[in-house]
Amino acid sequence: MVTVEEVRKAQRAQGPATIMAIGTSTPQNCVDQSTYPDYYFRITNSEHLVELKEKFKRMCEKSMIKKRYMYLTEEILTENPNICAYMAPSLDARQDIVVVEVPKLGKEAAQKAIKEWGQPKSKITHLVFCTTSGVDMPGADYQLTKLLGLQPSVKRFMMYQQGCFAGGTVIRLAKDLAENNKGARVLVVCSEITAVTFRGPSDAHLDSLVGQALFGDGAAALIIGSDPDPDLERPLFQLVSAAQTILPDSGGAIDGHLREVGLTFHLLKDVPGLISKHIEKSLNEAFQPLGIRDWNSLFWIAHPGGPAILDQVEEKLELKPEKLRATRHVLSEYGNMSSACVLFILDEMRKASSKEGLNTTGEGLEWGVLFGFGPGLTVETVVLHSVSA
């Protein structure tokens, strides 16, 4: 007769969780940031707000974003004037869009990840789906299971309304699932569509306007598992540790509220200051066991909440400009895609490392850090170990 301890030992994987494939996807509609203020004020019938438009132009110029992708086209917005108005009842119209489109965009990213992984999708044992775009029952996890034709026995986790830190959260959860379930292969999907937050401008709500200048649509997917089969699977990054914390004195710094008018967004000006003030504590706690104190010796994947956050973190930690190159590249090419951003940056980093002939997936370096920042203020910290190219 076996003991509980023996059963538990047999259930656990041997090695650390590993990212084995990455896929990304965006809507087809691409928006140029330089012409966006004119388009945005025209489509929302707000061209009479001349001073506010100038303010928005400056926001877009300072955003360090070149382009974004958005499901909401001019045609869709023309058909849904309440989505364009400032604070008009519009939740039903928004929900009708995202409940269908969020799983569909997630499917595109997931298919790319599964193709790279190279294994039959029947081997996927767990699904973690994350979105801040709408809420439904059964959830986007169920819809994606049906769209992909996954096994009905796949073990699903649905994470709604987490916000911008959640790219770290899904990795932390997938790590625990992979390491505690021998043979588990976890499909992780983050899919975000700004149809829940888009609305016209108001000079009484400038933080909403900041969101209109920053947010973009995108989905990203990972395959995560422990003990990769060397003949069939190719590891990209190992997940060494993962932590979450709420920053002190940060209540109300970033809030989102789902209302009749859609998802409203509030942020305090001091968000970059709060993050940069406390980030070294998270780094010390994560890397002390490894004896690492030189933050420039790491490869960096940081959620690009906005250029000010990146600038202040860079300054506070005395990071060399190239440390946040991959992060700034994704911000420039896609905008802030909430939970999906850090997964896009992982993809950008491994591709650039390969293209440049570097000897690891992490810009030629061995150890790296992934940060998620979002409502709370909540910070996710993941320690990564790169894989030899």
Curated annotation (Swiss-Prot):
Record's keyword annotation contains Endoplasmic reticulum: no
Xref: InterPro entries: Chalcone/stilbene_synt_C (IPR012328), Chalcone/stilbene_synt_N (IPR001099), Chalcone/stilbene_synthase_AS (IPR018088), Polyketide_synthase_type-III (IPR011141), Thiolase-like (IPR016039)
GO molecular function annotation: naringenin-chalcone synthase activity
EC class name: transferase
PROSITE patterns noted in UniProt: CHALCONE_SYNTH
Role of this protein: The primary product of this enzyme is 4,2',4',6'-tetrahydroxychalcone (also termed naringenin-chalcone or chalcone) which can under specific conditions spontaneously isomerize into naringenin.
Similarity remark: Belongs to the thiolase-like superfamily. Chalcone/stilbene synthases family.
UniProt protein name: Chalcone synthase E
Record organism: Ipomoea purpurea (Common morning glory)
Classification lineage: Eukaryota, Viridiplantae, Streptophyta, Embryophyta, Tracheophyta
